[in-house]
């Protein structure tokens, strides 16, 4: 089932086309990796999906009621709040439900007859929802996710304002996962994560029942968590089935097909141009040359295939006559 559709998406940034008349469908339960060169527009694309940025042209249709979560590592956090209070806020809707349930229980003491029956039925449904959500064991649910990302290392009683940038990133990711949105948008989620926490995140995402899109430069990570790849390249958004390695195989095949089609078109264009140049001035062939000219004008010329170049670097260095290459004291990472 489709939960989000993009039609005719076009957007420019800094006088450059990022997307041109692109279409895309996101289906329920898809695990999508978003790839492209730096500056291709990956983060812009995610921001448009999240509704944080308005596209220049085109339509983004979201399923009514779709809950979208976005990992914004530049978001401002409540500095005076504790880590646990911040994480607990992921379940604020359950706290509100519990308050409403208590209000109903209070009303029951003064109700009777049909009104009492109605309140009993309503409270039973609300109680069942709280039970099914594990409301009375939320701390355990919270720590299961947060511990997996290393939040326990800086403590649940810690004040957010005292945390480092890496610690805040882990905290925001933890809350986002706890909220379990219908569509989760992740921009470089492995930043600041240790290897053990990346491993935990891989296991979590591969078993995730809902939909997510993730931007990452970590190829090994993408290969393990993505079952679909969305590529942003040359102003086009294209969707490929499979992980990153499968995408590379399909992309290479499509690029070869495109290059062959481009070469055929260029050969045909040159052939027509040569004919027009040779026959345009002759009275006997000018009509046919003019006809070829009209055909040439109607051709939609294919864009020249881009050529990717590999870069290599070599940095000169001096050998140091010392045993201590690096000395660190009281280092704090993440």
Set out the residue ranges of the language-model regions.
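ABC ATP-binding cassette signature C-motif
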Residues: 1-262, 309, 315-334
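Intracellular alpha-helical coupling/juxtamembrane segments of multi-pass membrane proteins
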Residues: 250-275, 279-305
